[in-house]
Amino acid sequence: MAQLEGKVALITGASQGLGRALALAYAREGARLVVNARSEERLRPVAEEVEALGAEVVALPADVADSESVDRLVSQAADRFGGIDVLVNNAGLLGPRVKIEEFPEDEWRRVIDANLTGLFLVSKASIPHLNAGASVINLVSGVSVEGRPEWGAYSVSKFGVEGLNQILAAELEDRDVRVNAVDPGGMNTEMRAAAYSREDAESRVAPEENVDVFLYLASDDSRGVTGERFKAQEFRRR
C-alpha cells in the first residue's frame, strides 16, 4: 500500500518550489490533496499535475495572512474531504535583504504576516478539523536558529515559527496530533535565487529530491514523533 493512501493533505504555498514538489510526492503516495496559494493562475497547473497522477485534488486560492480567507480555505477543505490528516505550513515570503536600519516597516509587517501570522491562522483554523493521528509540518530555516545580517523579518518570523511549533506540539499531543518542524536547507528555488543571486542554482538540491522527511512525517511511520526539528537534507542522506 502507498504510504499516504487515503490521507487528506493541505499544503500552503503549493504553487511552486517545495510546495509543488510535496503535492506531487504526496499524490504519488495515495494522498488526497488540498493545494493552496495566493494566485489561482499559478495554482491551477499544479492541480492539473496532481490530477494527472490519478490523485483527487482541490485547488483553493487564499491569502494565509487574512483570517477570513483562511477560514474559507479550511472550511472548504474540511467540507470536501471531511477532515485533515496532514497540514504542511509551507507558505512564506523572503522580503528585502537589507539591514534593520534600512528595513521598510510595511515590508516588515508583510513578511511577518505571511510567515508567522499566516502559520498561526492556518493552524488555528485547522485544529478543529484535524483527524486523530494527524501530522502538522512547519517549515523553518537555518536563520530561524541563528540570526544573520540582512535576513531581517524573514529570520525573525522563522524564529517565531520555531516557538509556535513547540507550543502546538505540546498543546495538541493529547489529541493524538503530532507537530514537527523541518528545515529544508538550500534548494534550487525562486526564493533561494532571490536570496543568493550570485549562487550557482544547479549546485543546490532540487525540491523534488528533498521530500523524504516530509513523506516520513506525513505517514504513520512517524506516529509518536512530535515537537522535533528535522533537517531535510540530512534525513535524505540516511
Q: PLM features: residue spans?
A:
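Alpha-helical segment proximal to the catalytic Tyr-Lys
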Residues: 128, 169-174
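Active-site helix of classical SDR
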Residues: 123, 157
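The beta1-alpha1 cofactor-binding region of Rossmann-like NAD(H)/NADP(H)-dependent oxidoreductases
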Residues: 40-41, 61-73, 105
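Substrate-binding pocket helix/loop in short-chain dehydrogenase/reductase
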Residues: 98-100, 104-109
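Conserved glycine-rich Rossmann-like NAD(P)H-binding loop of the short-chain dehydrogenase/reductase
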Residues: 29-46
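C-terminal helical subdomain
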Residues: 174, 181-182, 189, 198-238
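Conserved glycine-rich cofactor-binding loop
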Residues: 8, 15-16
